[in-house]
Amino acid sequence: MAPTKRKGECPGAAPKKPKEPVQVPKLLIKGGVEVLEVKTGVDAITEVECFLNPEMGDPDDNLRGYSQHLSAENAFESDSPDRKMLPCYSTARIPLPNLNEDLTCGNLLMWEAVTVKTEVIGITSMLNLHAGSQKVHENGGGKPVQGSNFHFFAVGGDPLEMQGVLMNYRTKYPQGTITPKNPTAQSQVMNTDHKAYLDKNNAYPVECWIPDPSRNENTRYFGTYTGGENVPPVLHVTNTATTVLLDEQGVGPLCKADSLYVSAADICGLFTNSSGTQQWRGLARYFKIRLRKRSVKNPYPISFLLSDLINRRTQKVDGQPMYGMESQVEEVRVFDGTEQLPGDPDMIRYIDRQGQLQTKMV
C-alpha cells in the first residue's frame, strides 16, 4: 500500500501570490453642488445626493410637515377645502454639467440616470406618543400616526407627466393649487383632457393627480398606497436597496438640457390631536442617484438650432390671435416672378393637390 501524500505545500516551494484587489470606481472629488461644475472624462460616473421636503400644508411655523386640521363636508356640492389641508407633490430640478460644447456634431453626450437609492427620512419620529396626541387609554400614551398613507418618488430627464382624476368633480379647490380644468363627471374616472407636467413645487394636490402610465417614457416612478382608517404605516430603513432605472433596452432616463428631475410625496397617515382633530403627517425623502455619460445621436439639426436661437431673440407680444381656430388673418398672397397685366384683378389662383396652378373666376 502506497503512503498517503502529505497535505500542504512542499518544503521550499514559493509562497502563493495574494489575489489582486477588486476594481472599484475611483473617487476623484467629493463635495457640494459646486462639484457638478468640474469637467470629467467620458467614462466618469457622477453620484448626486439630495432630499425633498414634504409639502403637507404647514399651517404655521411650528407645524412643518403637518397639514391644517381636516374637516369633512356633509355634501358633495359644498366641498371646498382650505389650501393648507391639501398635501402636494414635491419636485425639483437638478442642473448637471454641460457635456457638449459643439451641438452640431452627429453624436452628443447626455447624462443617463442608472440607479437610485432612496428612503423616507424620520420614520422613528412617529414613535413620539407623548406630544399632544389623543390618548388611547386614560393613563396611557397617545394614538400613533395611522390611516391612509401614500409613498411615491420619481426620477427622470423630464418633468413628471400627470393625469388628473378627481374624487368629486364639484369640489372647489382654492387658489394657489393647480387642478384639472373644466372638470365634469367624467373626471371622476378617466378624462384624457386632464394632462399636466409637474412643473411647480407645492402646487399639484396629491388627491387630484397621479403619474400618467401612458407617458413618462423618460421618467421612472414608483409608488404605493394603503387605505384604511386604522392602517399603520409600514416603512423600511436600509442603505443596501438599489433601484435600477434602466428599461428593457438597457437605457435609463436621458437628462435633456443637462437637467435631472426628482419628485416625491410621502404621506405617512393622520396625526390625531388631543382635541380629536386630525392632520396629515408627511416626511422628507432622500435620493442618491448615479449617472453616467451616454453617447446618443444628435436629435437637433442645425436648422432647428438656428431657428430656435432666432425665435428666442424675438420680442414676445401678448396680442390678439393671428393663428389657430380664432385667427384674425383674412388672406395671404404669395407673388413669384412676373406676368402680363391681367384684365380681371379678382381672379382666384391656387395650387391644387397635384401641384398644378389653377385659375378660378369669381
From Swiss-Prot:
User: Region Disordered: what ranges?
Assistant: 1-21
Q: Known Pfam families for this protein? A: Polyoma_coat
Q: Which GO terms describe its biological process?
A: caveolin-mediated endocytosis of virus by host cell; virion attachment to host cell
Q: What GO molecular-function term can you cite, just one?
A: structural molecule activity
Supply the InterPro entries for this chain: Capsid_VP1_Polyomavir (IPR000662), dsDNA_vir_gr_I_capsid (IPR011222), Polyomavir_VP1_sf (IPR036931)
Modification Phosphothreonine occurs at: T338
As annotated in the record, motif Bipartite nuclear localization signal runs over 5-19
Keywords attached to this Swiss-Prot or TrEMBL record, sorted alphabetically, are:
Capsid protein, Caveolin-mediated endocytosis of virus by host, Disulfide bond, Host nucleus, Host-virus interaction, Late protein, Phosphoprotein, T=7 icosahedral capsid protein, Viral attachment to host cell, Viral penetration into host cytoplasm, Virion, Virus endocytosis by host, Virus entry into host cell
Q: What is the superkingdom listed in this entry's lineage?
A: Viruses
Query: What is the first-listed, main subcellular location in coarse terms?
Result: virion
Is Disulfide bond one of the keywords? yes
Quote the subcellular location field of this record.
Virion; Host nucleus
Q: GO CC annotation: what is one?
A: T=7 icosahedral viral capsid
Q: How does it assemble?
A: Homomultimer; disulfide-linked. The virus capsid is composed of 72 icosahedral units, each one composed of five disulfide-linked copies of VP1. Interacts with minor capsid proteins VP2 and VP3.
Q: How are the domains described in the entry?
A: A DNA-binding domain overlapping a bipartite nuclear localization signal is present in the N-terminal region of the protein and is required for efficient virus formation.
Membership in a protein family: Belongs to the polyomaviruses coat protein VP1 family.
What does the function comment of this entry state? Answer: Forms an icosahedral capsid with a T=7 symmetry and a 50 nm diameter. The capsid is composed of 72 pentamers linked to each other by disulfide bonds and associated with VP2 or VP3 proteins. Interacts with gangliosides GT1b and GD1b containing terminal alpha(2-8)-linked sialic acids on the cell surface to provide virion attachment to target cell. This attachment induces virion internalization predominantly through caveolin-mediated endocytosis and traffics to the endoplasmic reticulum.
Q: What is this protein called?
A: Major capsid protein VP1
Origin organism of this chain?
A: BK polyomavirus (strain AS) (BKPyV)
